[in-house]
Amino acid sequence: MKKWIPLPAILTATLVLAACSNSNQTKMPGHDMSKMDSASTAEHENLKQMSASLDPQFEVLTGNTFTLTAKESMLMLDDNTMKTAWTYNGTVPGPQLRVKQGETIKVVLNNELPEPVTIHWHGLPVPNNMDGIPGITQNAVKPKESFTYEFKVDVPGTYWYHSHQNGVNQVDKGLYGSIVVEPKDAEPVDKDFTLVLDEWMEDDSMAEMHSAGSSHSAHSQSKDSSEHANMDMSGMSDAEMMPLMYTIFSANGKTGSAIQPLIVKKGEKVRIRLINAGYLSHKMHLPGHSFTIVSTDGQPIHNPPETQDQLLNIAPGERYDVEFVANHPGKWLLDEHSTNPGAKSLAIPIVYEGEEHASVKSESMDLPVVDITKYGEAAKGTFSLDDQYDVTYSMDLNTDMSHGDMTFTINGKTYPDTPPLDVREGDLVKVKMVNRSPEDIHPMHLHGHFFQVLSKDGQPISGSPLVKDTLNILPGEEYVVAFKADNPGNWMFHCHDLGHAAKGMMSEVKYDGFKPDFTIDPTVNNMPE
């Protein structure tokens, strides 16, 4: 495990001092994707129809062969705030890969950064040797070298990709993007937006924390973060410190007034894909409209009902797709409703074409949060609490300060000493996860599989069958989930607050008899956290 300098000590000291170029891929940069020759081929006609509904704020790549280059670039969060970012293809987020269900895709990763990198396909059940985990499924890709990922995309939905090499720092610097697998029988919408949410630090003196091995890297900044100067954070929990460290919230690499609006027309059916690439949960509110949550982590909700004036809490690593009909003309703000200092900077305008009305947002901070375990219509799922399981496993998730540094444990151990979950191919597996941390939230992510959530705090799930790959567990909560061991390999099972993962909250699902198809390269500093 990586050695860390105690975060409270670093924060106290620091804050006191602080007074896609492949011929088989189609590029659709910016907002203008309508200049394709619709008469050339049937494929181009399909792309033209798709471009009418997509309104991306980043490059969208289609096809089945892609090139992603990891490199350093400057990111303008707004007119006054510039960051040195690590990127795929020079942007944060990186390009969206838009692919069709059933296709085999190939992604060439070129590394132009000074450190090794990988790509992990978050949520996609890829073969084990394509999962992008340094030292577990491959060696990290060294500077000036390349690696080719190739796999079939069978499960439609909203996913994202990010580096899993020293992810606590590399993802924090911007090394991520989105991937959408379109179903064969996709129900059409008029507009299809993707919003990738993240947080950034203001104080560039915290960059020292990165080189010192802190759990949360810093970014360069353009202004002084003096409001938190002289603040003593010693004794604070991770949950208390994080919002004070990350005070700039972003959507698609922009913050505040620089966030580009989502343009709609009255009567249009609109889908918004929300992806949380950051460390903090985001409670998002869509004012003035009823909406349905059609999927979570890419997996459909059964008969989702319309809801209004409820907050959608999106934890790190989670994805939610929502749909609404644009039937209330004006200019609205899809905004964050948390008490975090950075919340005010995350408000995405939804603007009706041709309307000049003033921006509208709800000032109420007391709106209820959607309970996704009670949302949607109940139906028979793949698993139940009454099934017979081949393997049962308990994960006690906790925070430990007993050795003078904050660590995050599974069953009292930190990775790589956490006990693995040993399975055989075909096993039915039931896992109980309990968050015993007094204040810290743990969004637990399983690689290579989806799991079905069976119960929460001892009560069976009452809404739609809930299938996820990332589950947000609040302090004191207990969940039981189940999955089938149907994808042989060695798979990470970890907290997607990557600071918690880097400080120990990781384990592995290990298949009996499986042997990786690579040899550890001793010249590569593989860092799977």
List PLM regions with ranges.
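Histidine- and aromatic-rich segments of cupredoxin/plastocyanin-like copper-binding domains
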Residues: 130-133, 139-142, 152, 232-370, ...
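Histidine- and aromatic-enriched segments that form or immediately flank copper-ligand environments
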Residues: 28, 69-182, 281-312, 332-344, ...
